[in-house]
């Protein structure tokens, strides 16, 4: 039977290269797990699987340049101020990996059958991964039906992970959440379901399973940028005065006046209050502001961005880097200033936090919070720190382990704001920034006050 199926599949392979077709002709279950589906997929799509296995969506790391050093960095080894790190927490974190079975450091990245084709190509809307199952599909999913109805990705495929990063809707990004599945024009003019109806890959163009674009949080040194200029020229306005702004002001700055337009986004996470006997409360939007196992949170909706100069490059804290606990630790942040001719003013979400660090070694700790003996199990920070550091291969390679002493330090993490582009009628107006406008902090940006008023003050090289 398998031989016959393979013959039929091969007969369709050339057709599949040019157009979608009915996979019911070549896919036959039943399937007990996702990797069983993949085994059938690669009978025709082995080359595609090999392409995908070269992507950062599979490896969760990318070689990149940070100031003064070349690093391999990605979700695999970065530290954030949400759930902190995947080390020791893999079964929970890797529910967003496009693969099956990444339970710990022994995961085999060369095993093609572990690639999850369905999470990106499901068209039924029924494919769901176990929240803490190391990427495996939920038992209730009809894998045969999903596999027989695959197609090009749509927003919901990407959103399965990117809308829910950090453990919930709108937690991390601020400009990506469930409202982007079928957005109205006021939410995003590009993805507007009744208008342009862009899919993610309309802008994040893809070739050989390599998807353009890099997130600052995990790949601050990534050199695969996309931007408004990919479609729009440098003089997009009829008003010449507005066009003079484009050399120093990014399109997003004026055209994304607010993020988290529909769903509140997390703006602060304080781990230091975890374990305290406090009442679990909710804010006006129904979001929890304290959880015993996670600490305290702050959420905001319709958030004006924070603005900073950005020249397309960024820097980041790497596991094992020394810190000064008296300072706010910047986990990722944009580079550039008013003197940099390549920099423009961009909008950002800045997520602040208070997270655990080794107070003897002065390094950030990657605690084990999930699973047996994790913090959520034992509520023991010393044990969670010891186990998390032991599970972190980067720390082990640097000869670092938990010293037995810990504290909590203030951190911040910068996130680029690129989505939720408003209709042009809702873009910022001159008076939002100039004259009495308070939108931009001129002095924080390096100006001597409003440059419209102080024409002899400090200027950007392009002004």
Regions found by a protein language model. Name each.
Residues 422-424, 431-434, 438:
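Terminal low-complexity/disordered tails
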Residues 294-334, 338-346, 351-355, 367-391, ...:
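Long, compositionally biased charged/polar accessory segments in the mid-to-C-terminal portions
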Residues 224-332:
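Repeat-solenoid scaffold signature
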Residues 9-19:
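Hydrophobic h-region of N-terminal signal peptides that target proteins for export
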Residues 2-9:
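Sec-dependent signal peptide recognition
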Residues 429-432, 446:
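Extended, compositionally biased alpha-helical segments that mediate assembly or anchoring
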Residues 18-154, 160-225, 229, 233-243, ...:
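Sequence context of c-type cytochrome heme-c attachment sites
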């Amino acid at each position: 039977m398998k031989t016959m199926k393979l013959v039929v599949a091969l007969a369709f392979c050339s057709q599949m290269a040019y157009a979608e077709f009915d996979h019911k002709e070549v896919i036959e279950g039943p399937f007990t797990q996702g990797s069983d589906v993949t085994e059938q997929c690669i009978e025709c799509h082995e080359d595609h699987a090999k392409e995908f296995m070269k992507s950062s969506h599979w490896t969760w790391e990318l070689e990149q340049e940070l100031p003064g050093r070349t690093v391999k960095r990605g979700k695999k080894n970065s530290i954030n101020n949400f759930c902190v790190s995947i080390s020791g927490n893999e079964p929970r974190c890797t529910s967003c990996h496009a693969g099956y079975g990444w339970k710990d450091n022994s995961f085999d990245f060369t095993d093609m059958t572990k690639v999850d084709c369905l999470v990106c190509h499901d068209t039924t809307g029924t494919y769901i991964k176990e929240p803490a199952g190391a990427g495996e599909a939920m038992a209730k999913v009809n894998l045969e039906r999903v596999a027989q109805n695959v197609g090009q990705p749509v927003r919901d495929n990407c959103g399965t992970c990117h809308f829910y990063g950090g453990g919930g809707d709108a937690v991390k990004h601020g400009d990506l959440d469930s409202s982007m599945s079928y957005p109205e024009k006021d939410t995003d003019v590009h993805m507007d379901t009744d208008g342009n109806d862009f899919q993610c890959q309309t802008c994040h163009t893809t070739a050989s399973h390599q998807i353009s674009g890099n997130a600052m949080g995990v790949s601050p040194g990534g050199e695969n940028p996309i931007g408004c200029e990919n479609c729009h020229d440098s003089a997009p306005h009829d008003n010449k005065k507005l066009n003079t702004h484009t050399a120093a002001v990014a399109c997003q700055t004026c055209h994304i006046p607010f993020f988290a337009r529909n769903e509140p986004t997390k703006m602060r996470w304080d781990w230091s209050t975890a374990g305290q006997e406090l009442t679990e409360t909710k804010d006006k939007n129904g979001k929890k502001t304290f959880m015993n196992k996670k600490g305290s949170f702050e959420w905001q909706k319709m958030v004006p961005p924070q603005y900073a100069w950005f020249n397309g490059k960024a820097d980041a804290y790497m596991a094992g880097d020394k810190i000064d606990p008296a300072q706010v630790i910047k986990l990722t942040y944009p580079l550039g200033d008013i003197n940099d001719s390549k920099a423009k003013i961009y909008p950002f979400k800045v997520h602040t936090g208070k997270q655990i660090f080794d107070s003897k070694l002065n390094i950030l700790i990657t605690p084990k919070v999930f699973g047996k003996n994790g913090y959520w199990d034992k509520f023991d920070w010393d044990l969670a720190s010891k186990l998390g550091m032991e599970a972190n291969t980067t720390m082990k390679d640097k000869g670092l382990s938990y010293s037995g002493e810990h504290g909590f330090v203030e951190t911040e993490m910068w996130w680029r704001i690129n989505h939720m582009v408003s209709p042009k009628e809702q873009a910022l107006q001159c008076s939002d920034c100039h004259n009495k406008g308070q939108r931009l902090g001129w002095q924080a940006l390096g100006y001597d006050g409003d440059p419209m008023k102080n024409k002899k003050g400090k200027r950007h090289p392009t002004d």
